[in-house]
Regions:
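Active-site-adjacent helix/loop segment of glycosyltransferases
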Residues: 32, 36-140
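Catalytic-site signature of metal-activated, phosphate-bearing donor transferases
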Residues: 1-2, 24, 104, 108-112, ...
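Residue-level signal for alpha-helical context at structural boundaries
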Residues: 25, 86-87, 142, 146
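Membrane-interface aromatic/basic loop that binds lipid-linked glycans or pyrophosphate carriers
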Residues: 124-181
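General helical secondary-structure elements
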Residues: 25, 62, 163-166
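A short, conserved alpha-helix in the catalytic core of glycosyltransferases
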Residues: 1-44
Length: 181
């Protein structure tokens, strides 16, 4: 549930996300505005996984790659400002994180190509092309007006890839123990 006044103020779900990660973006934006996002553990949610698109769909893969880039572009610099970084530094910091994320996506695309999954390879390339056309970069002045918030709960500040591959950590247990709550 969300307060209708907040829903209207933040313009609800961002329509650019279609079918994947739009609720994550909304919750992230709520936190950037200084609100808490909570859950009720006793609640039950019925969700048909793969109800929109089958798990093996190249379109689903494209949406996942594209929308995760949009999520970072929309919220990462603002998050760094909320944590106390100066706006220009926050933009550079976000750019670095997103650059490395794109490099890792390129590695994924290469693996798909080398393993004969040309449809997945194309999906990753299309995701990046579409993300570029959908992104509206935050400007320094807007970031400067934002101010600090108490932080973003549930954000992991490290690399899950390094934690998993290089340190041999079980990813979700490790992340849960390191998350900023």
């Amino acid at each position: 549930m969300t307060r209708s006044v907040l829903w209207r103020r933040l313009s609800g779900l961002d329509s650019r996300f279609f079918a994947h990660m739009e609720e994550i973006d909304y919750c992230w934006r709520l936190q950037l505005e200084g609100y808490r996002v909570c859950c009720i553990p006793q609640s039950v949610v019925y969700h048909l996984g793969g109800g929109t698109l089958p798990k093996s769909s190249p379109w689903k893969l494209k949406l996942n790659f594209r929308n995760s880039l949009l999520l970072l572009e929309n919220n990462l610099a603002r998050t760094f400002v909320a944590q106390g970084e100066r706006p220009r530094k926050a933009l550079r910091h976000a750019d670095r994180v997103i650059f490395w994320r794109k490099c890792l996506d390129g590695c994924s695309a290469a693996v798909y190509l080398l393993s004969g999954r040309r449809d997945y390879f194309k999906a990753v390339l299309e995701a990046h092309r579409e993300a570029r056309s959908l992104v509206s970069r935050p400007d320094v002045e807007a970031l400067a007006r934002q101010g600090k918030t108490s932080g973003i709960a549930g954000r992991y500040g490290g690399s899950i890839i390094l934690a998993s591959l290089l340190k041999g950590k079980r990813v979700f247990d490790y992340i849960e123990s390191k998350m900023v709550l």
